Amino acid sequence: MRKIIIFTFLLSILWSQFKTPVELSAFIEDQARPGEVSSVAIKATMDQEWYIYALRDQGQGPVASKVSLSGDFIKEVGRVTENDPQEKFDENFSTMTRTHQGGAEFIAPFRLKKDLEPGKYNVRVSIVYQVCNSSVCYPPKEEFLDVPLDVVSGTVRTERTKMDTNVQSLYDGSGNINLDAAIDSGLVSFIFLS
């Protein structure tokens, strides 16, 4: 039993020494007014040999990247977009995948609540990604960033009201149930479809 505890302890020390080859940064470019749409720009940088998986449409095996936003001042989150991924056969998983080689950029829009007081806020950004190169894939990793947002008073500007929402079709192009969309749409829809 003592050997197992020592082994587990040493393994956890080694695991904590792992430094991801991905460096994340995020920012919000402009000030926003209550009720407006703003967006967080997230950048993942890494050496050219490394890649992360795209947001959607992954093959069997790899973990798609995921960007989530949170904060009590956020009314709704829109559909996260990304720069164009490369489609390629992944030797690590023996399947076709969509990846971002050497880096990626994501834009995560969100709508502020209308009754929000002007002031400084932090948008909590969660990024889940799996990073690989030609010979190794690390387990999926979740990182958090707090991104400052400056909310100023004023009426909602018309050009800052449109946003693609996260609504996905409950069925994919082949007629199969899109499980992620069913779960996102709520418990009742998920139970109904199951």
Tell me the role of every PLM-derived stretch:
Residues 3-13:
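Sec-dependent N-terminal signal peptides
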Residues 186-193:
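Residue-level signature of transmembrane alpha-helical entry/exit and packing/kink sites
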Residues 17-186:
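Extracellular/lumen-exposed scaffold segments
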